[in-house]
Amino acid sequence: MAGHDVQYGKHRTRRSFSRIKEVLDLPNLIEIQTDSFKDFLDHGLKEVFEDVLPISNFTDTMELEFVGYEIREPKYTLEEARIHDASYSAPIFVTFRLINKETGEIKTQEVFFGDFPIMTEMGTFIINGGERIIVSQLVRSPGVYFNDKVDKNGKIGYGSTVIPNRGAWLELETDSKDIAYTRIDRTRKIPFTTLVRALGFSGDDEIFDIFGDSDLVRNTIEKDIHKNPMDSRTDEALKEIYERLRPGEPKTAESSRSLLVARFFDPHRYDLAAVGRYKINKKLNIKTRLLNQTIAEPLVDAETGEILVEAGTLMTRSVIDSIAEQLDNGLNKITYIPNDSAVLTEPVELQKFKVVAPTDPDRVVTIIGNANPSDKVRTVTPADILAEMSYFLNLAEGIGRVDDIDHLGNRRIRAVGELLANQVRLGLSRMERNVRERMSVQDNEVLTPQQIINIRPVTAAIKEFFGSSQLSQFMDQHNPLSELSHKRRLSALGPGGLTRDRAGYEVRDVHYTHYGRMCPIETPEGPNIGLINNLSSYGHLNKYGFIQTPYRKVDREAGVVTNEIVWLTADEEDEFIVAQANSKLNEEGGFAEPIVMGRHQGNNQEFPSDQVDYMDVSPKQVVAVATACIPFLENDDSNRALMGANMQRQAVPLIDPKAPYVGTGMEYQAAHDSGAAVIAQHDGKVTYADADKVEVRREDGSLDVYHIQKFRRSNSGTAYNQRTLVKVGDVVEKGDFIADGPSMENGEMALGQNPIVAYMTWEGYNFEDAVIMSERLVKDDVYTSVHLEEYESETRDTKLGPEEITREIPNVGEDALRNLDEMGIIRIGAEVKEGDILVGKVTPKGEKDLSAEERLLHAIFGDKSREVRDTSLRVPHGADGVVRDVKIFTRANGDELQSGVNMLVRVYIAQKRKIKVGDKMAGRHGNKGVVSRIVPVEDMPYLPDGTPVDIMLNPLGVPSRMNIGQVMELHLGMAARNLGIHIATPVFDGASSDDLWDTVREAGMDSDAKTVLYDGRTGEPFDNRVSVGVMYMIKLHHMVDDKLHARSVGPYSMVTQQPLGGKAQFGGQRFGEMEVWALEAYGASNVLQEILTYKSDDVNGRLKAYEAITKGKPIPKPGVPESFRVLVKELQSLGLDMRVLDEDDNEVELRDLDEGEDDDVIHVDDLEKAREKAAQEAKAAFEAEGKE
């Protein structure tokens, strides 16, 4: 027997064909959400408050300090928040201290700071009753970047940018004359020496001393001449910078100093964040700068006088490591003192070394390091600026390297916590202005923190973020896999990110650093391709927001691959050689072969095994969760694998789902972490279990109660239904399944079913990917799903009186009311069809709505019956089903309703949808198709044992698409069915062809895995043997019921009077320019005329035509289309005297919208009236005939 058995949870064993021993379990798959939010509550929120506060007033006599905060219990439970359309949020109370510096008086007070949305255990937020997800954002990391560009003459120029988290950008660039310039915040450029002089190093000699002698420095100094001898060089430089930043304003050295301090050195205005400081120190650190350079002077320890490194030594990684301690402690540190008129007068510490120029062995180049400012320094420092300039000047000498902005060492993730912290900071900084003003205006004696703090800007910022940010998305809840995928999504779009139109190919492309960090397969098709990605299965964020991936450490000395796990970011990994997870190991755990395949900085090549530093932990660390659920992924073309991964996320939960016979072993983990199942929180024993709740008695005697959700509507309108898995007496451990969620079976993801599939053509019905299906799948509810839709009706106060929910509806027969209760609301369990009343509602009708006759009757009889009009909630088209639930909210019951609303009724209708012609089906390999024919079971081809085939697919769909994985799955699936087992074939480590054929033989199938098939209609065998097997097929959310649409009379657009478009608006079909050409080409003038008039926007014409049709009279001639009138009016509004003339040159009067009664906009109601009027006239005529 090939393979070995693996237990997944307590309910499933699979035969696995994996050969690689897993040394590391998958991390919790939604930790990117939950960990980030937890960190925000524990540290992030406090940091934001400490950043903005304390706040002083303008005279510095009062100060408001932050003391601490407390988050209390949420107002609603999760379930209540869902039902009441409320947010699941907790009140936050912040303690402030107000200090009066004149009197020394201190007032401490706790202030309510609004309700803060709280993340659920599943990693989601409930905002206004809807479940939402904050998608993590992929952005460029703050730091310093160097780039090169080739001009039109083929000359290479260099550039550099310091990008902060917030604040002004500082750029350097060279021009064609080899002069180096700087730009501050995208303004006009100035020679870079001007900025150096402004920092207090004004003499040319000083500049040469710092940077060394090079063409760039020399050319720039020649350009930067002393224009005004009255000013010192520093003052002149400061004025020149001020002129660039504030053109047209009077320039003084003092104002320029304060402006530069505010731009770059004020922590309130300029922030690198922890990650920016880390990246700058890493880039401008002397250890990075010296790597692989030849030192030009001996390095001497200042304290001991010992020569550490001789001149002429190549500074390899090992040499640098040997003197790392001395380098960190300030080896070759030089302190420069700026002059007194500099922007900052503090001494500047740099580390300075001389190396041999790689391009010219006789030249010596000066290298400067920024002497590692502390992690606490969150602004840029003069040392950073000088070290950046040095790196920039060295690029021209061939020292240092330019950055690749698509490298994942330069792109980081802003997860929920950080996005929220930024939003709160925004709100607090708006509040800060407000607080300052109130402190200054009001009387100091009686002020309390409560009086000066206005929390509205903060609550508004949070509300705005959750409600309308591009990154706050309505959760994709088609099935648990789509939930999980959505929580792990990484978007490069959003505020501070890219825009679709500006993103080029490079940023969308797969980069070698994506390996183990971002999935190269799972990304949407269409305009967002490559901008929206998914975290790989083992991907994890470090404290700076860079994605790490785990590797096994290789002990080079012992020649053994250890089980020690090291998590590396992309730029750390660049220094090492990493072997693949499928490298063969011997008994001792060393590499079995002297040469192994490995990766180093984007090169995949063979390396001697004694040079390897790390090894992958698992073959599936490359791909995301949805991709890791595709068996035989290694045999599929990547384009089709992308479709397969994306389509699994669109699978509809079925009534009785089945886990795949051929899985990958990922199904258990995906279901477990998705949040859709009920998982045991503690060990214990089940004491009670039914369909609605499970009780577990813990060992310490306390009781855990788990509530099971039944048929709740998901965000996508599918049924969110959980099924209890345990029974009384079962012992459960923490992490065990208590109940399956939707699309799960026995604790595994089960998106579809395992039908018997044959690759064969049948009467041409599976042309172009169409799917032929047996009627068994319809009758046995194999692909039946339940869909829930929610409809609501509310009563409001109107000017003419309140609306009312009632059974007394005018002009409605008793038959239409048979399912309504005494209040006029539909009963639960009623079967409803299109047009049935769900909630009877009447609205008061003003006098102006009545016709002349009605007004007369009203005056005579005081007839009250006509005072209301029917505004009942009815079943829209295509929404037939069974009433599953009704919820009623009223002010009397204390429900929170919008202002002006007295009562709200929600009706949930469940539809049971069987599979039908037009529905979309798919496999897991991107093999999708539409059901074209449902064939009776007796006509389907059958196997020699009499089993009819369930589905027939077109064999032509396989070769050109190169997704051979489906054929492998087909054969292995048939073997699994015959053997009665489930199989796991993990990605890139699954069943080989030998394993496949061994299993096929073990199952007693023919050696080619094909079979003779018999035609169900004639009983004759088909000419050739056919590949028949079991393939996992899913039904997708694109169902024909949602797309079918037809209109006869419906709503019209206000301006053009043409029918609206789209199913949602009950619109018509667009008859566009090209369609008009087609009718013109056939000379079908009458057809064309009626399409452009009656059927579109000839308002009078369509009414008269309707009347003519109902009365059986000839249809009158059409009039002028409304859009022609709109055109004429538009031209008149431009001041053109536009008139319409007939053939005798007489002016034709076009109707005006505000003339006469005929010109009212015709709505469906008016057509109804016309219908009633015609019926009454017909009745009168009939009675008159009878009398005669």
Curated annotation (Swiss-Prot):
Keyword Cell division: no
Keywords assigned: DNA-directed RNA polymerase, Nucleotidyltransferase, Transcription, Transferase
InterPro entries xrefs: DNA-dir_RNA_pol_bsu_external_1 (IPR019462), DNA-dir_RNA_pol_su2 (IPR015712), DNA-dir_RNAP_su2_dom (IPR007120), DNA-dir_RNAP_su2_hyb_sf (IPR037033), RNA_pol_bsu_bac (IPR010243), RNA_pol_bsu_CS (IPR007121), RNA_pol_bsu_protrusion (IPR007644), RNA_pol_Rpb2_2 (IPR007642)
Gene Ontology CC annotations of this record: DNA-directed RNA polymerase complex
Main EC class the enzyme belongs to: transferase
UniProt cross-references to CDD domains, sorted A to Z: RNA_pol_B_RPB2
GO BP terms in the entry: DNA-templated transcription
EC number: 2.7.7.6
Substrates-to-products reaction catalysed: RNA(n) + a ribonucleoside 5'-triphosphate = RNA(n+1) + diphosphate
GO MF term (any one): ribonucleoside binding
Subunit annotation: The RNAP catalytic core consists of 2 alpha, 1 beta, 1 beta' and 1 omega subunit. When a sigma factor is associated with the core the holoenzyme is formed, which can initiate transcription.
Function statement: DNA-dependent RNA polymerase catalyzes the transcription of DNA into RNA using the four ribonucleoside triphosphates as substrates.
NCBIfam families per record: PRK00405.1, rpoB
Family statement: Belongs to the RNA polymerase beta chain family.
Protein name: DNA-directed RNA polymerase subunit beta
Organism this protein belongs to: Streptococcus gordonii (strain Challis / ATCC 35105 / BCRC 15272 / CH1 / DL1 / V288)
